[in-house]
UniProtKB/Swiss-Prot annotation:
Keywords: ATP-binding, Cytoplasm, Nucleotide-binding, Nucleotidyltransferase, Transferase, tRNA processing. Belongs to the SUA5 family. TsaC subfamily. This is Threonylcarbamoyl-AMP synthase. InterPro entries: DHBP_synth_RibB-like_a/b_dom (IPR017945), Sua5-like_dom (IPR006070), TC-AMP_synthase (IPR023535), TC-AMP_synthase_SUA5 (IPR050156). Pfam families: Sua5_yciO_yrdC. GO terms for molecular function: ATP binding; double-stranded RNA binding; L-threonylcarbamoyladenylate synthase; nucleotidyltransferase activity; tRNA binding. It is an enzyme of class 2 (transferase). Its main location: cytoplasm. The gene is tsaC. It comes from Haemophilus influenzae (strain ATCC 51907 / DSM 11121 / KW20 / Rd).
Length: 183
């Protein structure tokens, strides 16, 4: 499928696969509880874990992130350029749905400059949920064909290439800089 078709599927609260910096991600509209539930069911992922959101700019995260709790130094770190994709755990607004935050009062976000992510966010007007496109026990998909093999030939997948990163993103707490996952 092309970008416009994937954007239409996202607006219709479907779960789609799209390329990120290193692997294909499974994504949906983060403001749709039914779409997120489909995603969690597909991944067999407990809601308590929370989800990562990706977007090309901070504006897409404004509905979810409590920017009043982020100081200038942290904001600079959040917007920094790093040699590997970096996901940051940041304070969530009290209105951010639990189906995104899980058992936490924070949310994971990643500024992503992959052209596919940028285009899909601009076409839909929202950030995307991002969890690796793979079934439990299977390796993350790095091509659209691998996505179809794991999820079926009819699964909505954006036919574009992943970026040059070799590993999924590093995950750090923005306030403490604590490393949760090595990238």
């Amino acid at each position: 499928m092309n970008r416009e078709q994937i954007a239409d599927a996202l607006r219709q609260n479907q779960v789609v696969a799209y390329p990120t910096e290193a692997v294909f991600g499974l994504g949906c509209n983060p403001q749709s509880e039914s779409a997120v539930k489909k995603l969690l069911d597909l991944k067999q992922r407990p809601v308590e874990k929370g989800l990562i959101l990706v977007a090309p700019s901070l504006d897409f995260f404004r509905p979810f992130v409590d920017f009043e709790q982020i100081n200038d130094e942290q904001l600079s770190r959040l917007q920094g350029k790093y040699e590997r994709p970096t996901t940051w755990i940041v304070p969530a607004k009290s209105t951010t749905p639990h189906f995104l935050t899980g058992k936490f009062d924070s949310i994971a976000i990643r500024l992503c400059d992959h052209p596919s992510v940028k285009a899909l966010c601009e076409l839909t007007g929202f950030a995307l949920t991002s969890t690796s496109a793979n079934l439990t026990g299977e390796p993350p998909c790095r091509t659209a064909d691998e996505v179809r093999l794991q999820f079926g030939s009819d699964f909505p997948v954006l036919n574009e290439m992943v970026g040059r990163a070799h590993n999924p993103s590093e995950i750090r707490d923005l306030r403490t800089n604590q490393l949760f996952r090595q990238g």
